[in-house]
Amino acid sequence: MRLKKNDNVLVIAGKDKGKTGKVRYAYPRTDRVLVEGVNMIKRHSRAKGQAKQAGIIEREAPLHVSNLMLLCSKCNKPARIGSRELADGKSVRYCKSCNEVID
């Protein structure tokens, strides 16, 4: 999976198309990520004694990575990303449009 925690992404498909946010958590096994403020769902919770109140809670749901594009920090555009190996053997991600190393 090419998206990591704290990446800025743009939603390119679905009900939140056009929104941007930061990746809060990545689920590599299912190719999904949790993005701040995007794909909000409502959960109904029951009261558990005096500690937890009953009510409707809004929270983010994971999105599939195919519906997201990384926002390049150099060219400030949504970009396809690739990976390449540096001379020292370290693998890094790079923006395919401006050819800059992302991390």
From Swiss-Prot:
GO biological process terms on file: translation
Pfam families: KOW, ribosomal_L24
Signal peptide: none
GO MF, one example: rRNA binding
Keywords: Ribonucleoprotein, Ribosomal protein, RNA-binding, rRNA-binding
Assembly and interaction partners: Part of the 50S ribosomal subunit.
Family in the record: Belongs to the universal ribosomal protein uL24 family.
HAMAP family: Ribosomal_uL24_B
Designated name of the protein: Large ribosomal subunit protein uL24
Organism: Dehalococcoides mccartyi (strain ATCC BAA-2100 / JCM 16839 / KCTC 5957 / BAV1)
Name of the gene: rplX
